[in-house]
Amino acid sequence: KRSAIVMQNTAIGVTINTLVTLIQYYNIPLPMLISYRGEIGEPVACQVEMAVHTKALLDQLNIPTYHFHTKSDADELDAILNHSFMAKKPVAILTDAGFWQGA
């Protein structure tokens, strides 16, 4: 069996220590499906602040990041998952509102 995690981008801040000290240090593959909150039209204002930092934090951690805007972007999912498990590294897949609304 293989693991993955589903979370909102606001959880990135509280998972940094675990990502660095466990996942990356021990070469544990971990696909992260992340609902990307805080873009234009976000109804909850506090979500916007974390959206400003999400991609920069993932970049600083050297975690490959993919951003799904439309359903057709999910065609890349198998390749992304295979890369995570082959390379034994975490990957982040950001999914914005357009993706979930079927754009």
Segments from the language model and where they lie:
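Fold-independent oxyanion-binding glycine-rich loops
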Residues: 7-9, 34-36, 61, 68-71, ...
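Hydrophobic/aromatic beta-strand patches that form the interior of the parallel beta-sheet core
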Residues: 4, 31, 66, 91-93
